[in-house]
Amino acid sequence: MTKKVIRKPDSLHEVFERKGGSAPTATHYCAGCGHGILHKLIGEAIDELGIQERSVMISPVGCAVFAYYYFDCGNVQVAHGRAPAVGTGISRAEDTPVVLLYQGDGDLASIGLNETIQAANRGEKMAVFFVNNTVYGMTGGQMAPTTLIGEVTVTCPGGRDPRYAGYPLHMCELLDNLQAPVFIERVSLADPKSIRKAKRAVKRALEIQRDGKGYAFVEVLSPCPTNLRQDAEGAERFLKEEMEREFPVKNFRDRSSETEPLIRSESDFSRESLDRIFQIKEDSVPDPVDDPEFREVRVKIAGFGGQGVLSMGLTLAQAACSEGRHTSWYPAYGPEQRGGTSSCGVVISGERVGSPAVDTPDVLVAFNQPSLDEFAGDVREGGIVLYDTATADFSKKENLRAIGVPALEIAKEHGTGRAANTAMLGVMMALGITGLDEESFRDAIRFTFSGKDKIIDINLKILEAGADWARKNLEGEF
């Protein structure tokens, strides 16, 4: 003969040691709060489905932020409204997790609304339990996105007025417009009969996660007697007569029987795969070699978008890589495709680069006047400023070595005005200010434009033209 034992589910701690305090077997929730009921329903469903070891409970800011006190499974606390983002990461990073999101209306339907819609639209594998009690519970009962018309709260003492605060947000109806969700249902905790129905919805949502079928959403109409100043009878009446009238209790969809498990391809971030994707060969990018004797050089390159600022930096960084130097390339640019401000920093070092940011450059290469005006003051004392005389003018300063280079003119004379950046690279190559061999610059040009023989030839020609100009006009400069 079996004996019925009334006890907590195994997936809920018997004693809440993480909570601490003088009452380690009591929750931190107010008397009559619906969170305790829903916790038990979820715990029972986890036990019945045998998924305790696979379950990860995600609890953002709100009354249930301390859900990890109670659930004996994986637990992650997250920032306000960001549970879907973290849940997506866990769901995709692990093979078979059962991801549970436990969110309130002030969290999910307000600051987290976009996150929720996007995760639902992608059909992420997660069960979302949305607790709708019409107020911000943790912070004292302020108006929430789900507050009823005319309902009095701390922040709408005259009742919610739709002329100023809009109408209650219906999350189930909103998500039901999307194609991806597998299961959407609204339930209530108004009375024992409603709670039994809620248990079935909770279990179905977790079954879908157990089977890896996709997104499940359960909205739970829940009492908040403390903030709404209700006794047990008043809370039940409010749920049945007001909340359920505004938010009808119903199943919106259950496609679990016709949905196959969602299996995503496994990501491959191995070095071999990345090298293949970016066409990196071992002989083109050797591992850097420590050389404490090599003097670090920090270069800032700036100009308008479309002047080849970023590609010049990449080519310079490639030249350094080909010599086995530690190097970094760090871009900064505006939203414009052409004409906006663009810059990048390149660090060439004999040791590991600590930061790619070039705040105090040794060398500034400026292709326009705004770049000179903005960055010349940052160049270290004794540093070098190279600028294109076609687009900028610079008054020499005693503590800087400024060189005007007709880069645009050189490029036009030798093939194309679009390669003024390559002409400037040639000047840097001839001056030897980077500590790199000239052949490394040529190899970098070939690598940058690999597969484009005509472009390689033109750029090598302009590179040499820039270098020749420097040798003729800057002899003895360095």
Curated annotation (Swiss-Prot):
InterPro entries the record matches: 2-oxoacid:Fd_oxidoreductase (IPR051457), Pyrv/ketoisovalerate_OxRed_cat (IPR019752), Pyrv_flavodox_OxRed_cen (IPR002869), THDP-binding (IPR029061), TPP_enzyme_TPP-bd (IPR011766)
Database matches in Pfam families: POR (PF01558), TPP_enzyme_C (PF02775)
pH dependence of activity: Optimum pH is 9.7.
Thermal properties: Optimum temperature is 75 degrees Celsius.
EC number: 1.-.-.-
One Gene Ontology term of the molecular function aspect: thiamine pyrophosphate binding
Source superkingdom: Archaea
Entry keywords, A to Z: Oxidoreductase
BP terms from Gene Ontology: organic acid metabolic process; sulfur compound biosynthetic process
CDD domains according to UniProt: TPP_OGFOR
Transmembrane portions of the chain: none
Subunit architecture: Heterotrimer of the VorA, VorB and VorC subunits.
Protein name as it appears in the record: Ketoisovalerate oxidoreductase subunit VorA
Organism whose genome encodes this protein: Methanothermobacter marburgensis (strain ATCC BAA-927 / DSM 2133 / JCM 14651 / NBRC 100331 / OCM 82 / Marburg) (Methanobacterium thermoautotrophicum)
Gene: vorA
